[in-house]
């Protein structure tokens, strides 16, 4: 589907609807290319990662340095070129309850089908880093109520994330999640469950739909979506796109630097380095046909023939 398709945007299914049919796996993305590749891999949903966005868009670590305007712009661009629903990490909501209301409305209007709001103090940091602090229990629930108010009627679900597991205790994390559900959250998310026993226990004791963030290279144990589904989690995120891209860029960057050529790329059977390969992922032929449908005379974009 082409850019800014209203029909496409309205036809995107919500997360609660998807979760009724089974556990939804939503890999993390950070730009239009990663989002398109997740969609074309066959996943039913995606999650815009705050940490990966900070690195790719601004070139900074995940310590609360991305602005709301920067985030909204990326949400708009990804929404315009994909057809699967997206969760958006809104960190701490960019302020108090009033700031949060504006944040939620702007992100929902930009095309998000879910947001996840955390209870860290500002400036926040990646949930898998030490040195986190969280706001008070009552303040967090107040922000959940404000976010729910802002999202009412938008079709955008509210995911209540807590970092209290590592900062305070598992019991406090469970309590915050249950109170968040009572305050209107649609889904809950305990960041960084460190053991399988705790993942199972939280799955049993937290009310309502639950999300699990799969990051086995971080604080969480190695598990599969099938496993956590059996433990009561209906939404699972994973971080493969950026880490795979980083590894490939490091590998081929070294080879190309040492050879002084792009031959390591062009001769690798796993890599299609043709420009048309990239552009076809984003609908170049459909774009050109669209231009001609209005009476234009735009030539199609076939590849140049290679001369030996």
Briefly describe each language-model feature range:
Residues 259-308:
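Flexible C-terminal active-site loop/helix
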Residues 231-276:
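Shared catalytic-loop signature of beta/alpha-barrel
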Residues 2-214, 218-237, 244, 251-254, ...:
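Alpha/beta enzyme core
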């Amino acid at each position: 589907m082409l850019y800014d398709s209203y029909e496409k945007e309205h036809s995107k299914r919500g997360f609660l609807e998807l979760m009724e049919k089974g556990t939804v796996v939503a890999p993390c993305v950070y730009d239009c290319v990663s989002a398109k590749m997740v969609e074309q891999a066959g996943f039913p949903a995606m999650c815009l990662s705050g940490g990966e966005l900070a690195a790719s868009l601004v070139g900074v670590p995940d310590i609360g340095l991305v602005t709301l305007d920067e985030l909204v712009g990326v949400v708009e661009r990804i929404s315009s070129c994909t057809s699967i629903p997206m969760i958006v990490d809104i960190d701490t909501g960019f302020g108090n309850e009033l700031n949060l209301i504006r944040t939620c409305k702007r992100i929902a209007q930009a095309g998000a089908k879910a947001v996840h709001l955390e209870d860290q103090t500002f400036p926040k940091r990646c949930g898998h880093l030490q040195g986190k602090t969280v706001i008070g229990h009552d303040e967090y629930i107040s922000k959940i109520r404000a976010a729910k108010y802002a999202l009412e009627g938008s079709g955008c679900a509210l995911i209540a994330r807590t970092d209290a597991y590592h900062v305070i205790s598992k019991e406090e994390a469970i309590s915050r999640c249950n109170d968040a559900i009572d305050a209107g959250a649609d889904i809950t998310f305990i960041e960084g469950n460190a053991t399988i026993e705790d993942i199972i226990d939280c799955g049993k004791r937290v009310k309502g739909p639950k999300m699990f963030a799969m990051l086995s290279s971080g604080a969480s144990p190695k598990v599969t979506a099938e496993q956590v589904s059996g433990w009561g989690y209906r939404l699972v995120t994973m971080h493969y796109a950026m880490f795979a891209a980083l590894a490939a860029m490091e590998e081929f960057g070294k080879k190309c630097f040492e050879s002084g050529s792009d031959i390591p790329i062009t001769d690798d059977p796993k890599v299609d380095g043709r420009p048309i390969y990239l552009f076809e992922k984003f609908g170049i032929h459909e774009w050109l046909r669209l231009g001609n449908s209005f009476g234009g005379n735009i030539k199609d974009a076939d590849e140049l023939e290679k001369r030996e």
